[in-house]
Swiss-Prot record:
Keywords: Cilium biogenesis/degradation, Coiled coil, Membrane, Transmembrane, Transmembrane helix. Residues 605-624 are annotated as: Disordered. Disruption phenotype: Deficient mice are viable and display no apparent abnormalities. However male mice are infertile. Mice display an abnormal sperm flagellum morphology. Furthermore, mice have low sperm motility and decreased total sperm count. The sperm flagella of deficient mice have abnormalities in the cytoplasm removal and the flagella axoneme lacks microtubule doublet 7 and the corresponding ODF. GO terms for cellular component: membrane; outer dense fiber. Residues 598-634 form a coiled coil. The gene is Tmem232. This is Transmembrane protein 232. Plays a critical role for male fertility and sperm motility by regulating sperm cytoplasm removal and maintaining axoneme integrity. High expression in the testis and weak expression levels in the spleen, liver, brain, uterus, lung, epididymis and kidney. Not detected in the heart or ovary. It holds the Pfam family TMEM232. It is found in: Membrane. The chain crosses the membrane at residues 163-183. It is a single-pass membrane protein.
Amino acid sequence: MKAYKPPVVNKFGVISSTYHEELLKSIFESSNRRKSQKPKPSFSISKEFILRFNHTDNPAEEEELLEQARRLIVRSKRKLGLKTLGSGKHVHLPTAWAEVIYLAQCKGEIQDEALNMLHASLDHVSFDHDQLPALFFLAESVLYRLCCDAFMKGYLYSVEIKLVKIGYLIFLRLFVFFLHGHLESFKQHLLRLQPYLYALHFSEPSYYKYPNIISNVQFILKTSEIICKRELHSEPFVESPDETEDPYSDLNHLQLNKRGYEVNHLLWHSVAAWSCVQNNRPQLTEVLEHLLFYKTQLQTKCWLDSALALMVLGEAAKLDMACLKTLMDLVTDFLENILSAQNQEENYNIYDTSWASEIVFTYTTIIAEVCLYAATSDLRKTALIGFCACKSPQQGISLTDKSEELPELDGASILTLLKYFSSRISDNCEKVIWIGYYGIVYNLVKMSWELQGEQDQDGLRNMIWQTLQKIKDYEQDPRIRCALVIAQAELNGPSDPFCTKATPNSGEEVFSKYIGWRIATTLSRLFFPSLDVAPPKTPVEVDLPRKHTIRERQPAKKRVLRFILKDHSSVVEVSMTPYPNFFTKADKKLEEIIDHHWQKDMEARKREEEAYKAQNQKDKEEKEKIHFQEIMKQRERKLNKQTKPYEIILSEKESGSEKKCGFFELKPSTAPNAK
C-alpha cells in the first residue's frame, strides 16, 4: 500500500532550520507577552483598589475611584437580590457577600452602603447549607474588624454598631444550621474563629453601658460556646483561672453528644403555634395552652432557646391575636417571677441578671416589630397599649409622678412596660429594670424613625412622638438619656473611626424584618416535615448508608413531644407554606391589572350600548316626524287645507277683540270660505 505524504509548505521561504526555530520561539513569546499584559477589568475589587481609594489625595482620581466603587455597589446589589428577597437567576450570594465585605473596607459612604446591604441581605435571604463557607468567611471578617479596629477606639461609633448587628445575624444563622446538623464538616472554620471570640469575650465589659450592643455580643458568645462544645467536643474556649465557678456552667446539663442538640419544649411549641397559624389549623388553642404550661422554661439560664422561642412566637403574634396574648402573658409571668426572686435575694448571683436582662431586651425588640409590622391595626394597637379598655392611652403614662404607690405589672405592651419600668428606675435598681426601660426607649426612637412618611399611621407615630417628648422632658436618669442619644446616632449616622467623611444613609433597615420569618419557616420544616419529604410508613429499601438514616431519625425522636404526634398526627402532615414571595405578589398584581382592564372594557361596552339606544331613539323620532309630514301633505292635497286636523280657525270679530286685548295677531286663514 502506498504511503500518502502531504506536501510541505514553507511559509517562511528558504531559511535555515536554526533560524526557523528562533523565529517560532520569538512568535510564541510575543503571543504570551500580549496575554500577560492584558489589563484587569475595571470592575474587579483588589487590595490595590482599596488602598488607592482610602489614601488618594488627587481630587480627580478620588472622583474616578468613587464612581467605580458606586458601579461595584450597583453590581453587588443585583447579585444580592435585595429587591427579590435573595431569589432569582442573577443572585449569587457567596460571591456577592465576599465583594460587599471587601467594599466595606473603603471609607465614607461606600462603607456605610456596603454594611447596610450586607445587613439587609443577611436579614431576608433563605437558609441554604451551601452558604456556610461564605458565612464563616463573613464571621471571621466581622470579628477581625471588631477586635482589631473597633476595640482600639475610645468611643462608640455607628460602624461598630452595624458590625455587631451583622455579627448577630451571622451567628443566628450558624445556630440554625447547627440545629440541622450541617456544621460537622466545618471544625477547621470553628477553630479559626476561637481567637477572635476570645478577644470579644474580654472586650465585653466595655459594652455594659449599651444594652443594645451587649445583647448582640452575648448572643454571639453564647452561640459560639454551644456550637464549639458540641462540634469540637472540647471545653469552652473561655476559661477564667481566677474564678472557681465557670460562668457557663449552665451548659453542663445539656446533652451535647453525638446524638445532637436537644431543644426545649418552649421552642418546640412556639414553632408548632406558628405552623398552626400559617396553615389555619384548629389545634392552635391547644398548642398555646401547652406552651403556657412550659412557661417556666423561660426562666432557665440557658436562654438561647428561649430567645428563639420568643422570636418565633413574635412572628405568629403578627398574624394572630391569641398568639400575641400568649406572648404577653409569658413575659408578664417571667418579669413577676424574676423580680420577686431578686427582691428576696436568695440564690442570686451576677449571672442571673445577665440572662434575664437578655430575655427582656429581646422581647422589647420583638414587641416593637409586632407594633410596626403586624397584619391588622388591632394587633398593632394591642402591642402598643395592651388589652385595656381605656379611651386615651396617654392618660395612663406619667413619668413625673414617682410616688410611693408603684403600679403593678398588668401586661407586657409597650406603654404598660414603659409605665412600669419608669416608676421603678433608680440608681440602685435591678439590672432588669433599667435595661428593660432602655430597650423600650431605644425601640421607640427607632419606631418613630421607621414611621416617617407613613400617612396611614400618623396616629401611631404621633403617640410615639408624644411619649418620647415626655421622656426627654422629665427623665433625668443618664442611662435612659443615653438610649435616646445612641438610637438617634445609629439612625443619623455620625462620623466613625474608619472613614474621614460619613453621610447619613436613609436606606438603612432599622429592624430585622424577615429573619424571624425565615427562622420560623426553617424550624417548622425541621420539626414538622411535610408528607413529600417525610419517610414512608411502610418500610422501603433505600440505597443510603445506615448511619445516615439513623442520624436523620434520631434527633426527630428527641425533639418530638407526645401531645402533638400522638393525639394530633395531622400536624405532621401539614405543608409549610411561607409568606407570599416575590412571584406570588407579582401574580396577584397581574390579576389586579387584568381585573382593572376588564372593568374598563365593561364600562366601554356600557357606553356603547347607551349610545346605540340613543341613536335608535333619535331614528325613531325622525321616522315619526317624516310620517307626520307625509300625512299633512296628503291632507293638503285632498282638502286644500294647510291646518292640522281639528285646528280651530278664528273669525275676524274674534280676531279684532283679541288684538284689543293685547294678544298676538294671528295670520288670516287661507281657506276660501273664511270671512
